Amino acid sequence: MQFSNLDTLRTRGTRKWTQFDDDVIPMFVAESDFPTAPAIKEAIIDACEREMFGYTPAPHAHHLGEAVADFYDWRYGWRPDAAKIFPVADVVRGVLLAIQYFTDGDVIVPVPAYFPFLPIAEAAGRNRIDISSDKGLEGGLDMAEVEEAFKNGAGSIIVTNPFNPGGWMFTSEELDQICDIARRYKGRVLVDEIHAPLTYGKRHVCAAANNPDVCITVTATSKAWNVAGLKCAQMIFTNDEDVKTWNAINPVAKDGVGTLGIIAAEAAYESGREHLDWQVEQLKANRDWLVENLPSLIPGIRFEIPDATYLMFLDFKDTKLGVDKPAAYLLKHARVALSEGVDFGPGGEHRARMNFATSPEILKEATERIARAIEVV
C-alpha cells in the first residue's frame, strides 16, 4: 500500500489539514492518513456518475442494516437484528438522542473522555456525573464508583468501547457488570463502538449481545474507513420498545444523514474488509514502533499500550517537559499538533493524545520532533 506524503495529504483540505500552518504535522483529530478503501471510492464515484445527490433513499431502497449486521457477525461474532438498525448523522448525535429520548436522570461519563461527550449531558438538559476511567495501569472503571453514581441519580452511562482516549477495551465480564448495575437502577448503557473494528489481537465484545434490554449501541465507519465527513452512523437497538421509541421521535431530530454516507458505509461493511485488515496490520506496526522507541526518545514518558484505536494517550509528567498542557508547548516548539489532555476532562493533566494513523515515515519524523523539543527544555 502506498502512503501519501505531507504535501499530498494537505490537499485533502479537511479539518486535520487546515487547522494549522503547513509546517505543523497534525496528529490531533481522529482522521487517518491512509488511502481510502478502493471499494468506497468506487461506490462514491458510481453514485456521483448517477448524480445521487438528493435526499437519502427510502429505507427499503438501501441495505445498510443488513450490511451492519453481517459485518458485526463476521468481526465480533454477534449478529444484531438488521431491522433494528437505523442511520443517524454521527455517533455524537446518536448518543445525544439516546440520552434525550431513552433515559432519565443524570449521565455518567468516565473521564478522561472523548471530549464531545463532556458537554453532551448539558446539551440534553441533564447533569454530568464524572467517574474515573483510569482504574489500574491499563485503564478501566471502578464498579463501586459506577454503582454509586447510579445510586445518586444517574439514569445512564456512556461506555466508549474501545475507549477513547486510552485505547483499552472492556471485557465481557466488565460490560456485564456495568449492565447489571444499570439494570438494578433502571438505567441505560449507551455504547459507542466507533473504534471497534480497529483492535490488535483481542476481539471486541459487544455489550448488547448479553444485555439487549439495557444497551443502546451507536457505531459508524468513520474511524476504521475515514469517512466522517459523509455523515452516516448507525443506531443499533436490541429490544422492540426502543424501536418503537425511535420510530416515534420527530424526524427533524433524527435528520442529517448523508446519501453518500449510506453508500460509503454499505461499501465499507460489505467490501472494505480486506482494506480494514491491512490498516489494522499497519496500525499495529506503528503502535509497536512507538512502544519500542518512545521510552528512549523521550525519557520519563508514560503511556497505556492501546489494545485498539489508533490513539495513544501520552503522559509527560515525568519528562523534562512536565507541564499541565504539553500539547500547547509541542505545537509551538516541535510543530507537531497533538490533542491536549485537559480537553478530555479531569485526569487529562500532563497528557496529550497522539493519532498514529499515518505512514511510518511521518510518525518517525513527528516523534523525533517531539523528542528534540523536549530535550532542550
From Swiss-Prot:
GO MF annotation: an example: transaminase activity
Reaction catalysed by this enzyme: an S-substituted L-cysteine + H2O = a thiol + pyruvate + NH4(+); S-(1-hydroxy-3-methylhexan-3-yl)-L-cysteine + H2O = 3-methyl-3-sulfanylhexan-1-ol + pyruvate + NH4(+); S-3-(hexan-1-ol)-L-cysteine + H2O = 3-sulfanyl-1-hexanol + pyruvate + NH4(+); S-(4-hydroxy-3-methylbutan-2-yl)-L-cysteine + H2O = 2-methyl-3-sulfanylbutan-1-ol + pyruvate + NH4(+)
PTM sites of type N6-(pyridoxal phosphate)lysine: K223
Any GO BP: biosynthetic process
Cofactor names: pyridoxal 5'-phosphate
The UniProt record lists the keyword Cell inner membrane: no
Keyword terms of this UniProt record: Aminotransferase, Lyase, Pyridoxal phosphate, Transferase
Known EC number: 4.4.1.13
Function (record text): Catalyzes the cleavage of the cysteine-S bond in various cysteine-S-conjugates. Cleaves L-cystathionine, as well as S-substituted cysteine conjugates S-benzyl-L-cysteine and S-ethyl-L-cysteine. Releases four human body odoriferous sulfanylalkanols: 3-methyl-3-sulfanylhexan-1-ol (3M3SH), 3-sulfanylhexan-1-ol, 2-methyl-3-sulfanylbutan-1-ol and 3-sulfanylpentan-1-ol; the release is obtained after the sequential hydrolysis of the Cys-Gly bond of the odorless Cys-Gly-S-conjugate precursors by the dipeptidase TpdA, then the cleavage of the resulting Cys-S-conjugates by MetC.
UniProt record similarity statement: Belongs to the class-II pyridoxal-phosphate-dependent aminotransferase family. MalY/PatB cystathionine beta-lyase subfamily.
Protein name: Cysteine-S-conjugate beta-lyase
Gene, per the UniProt record: metC
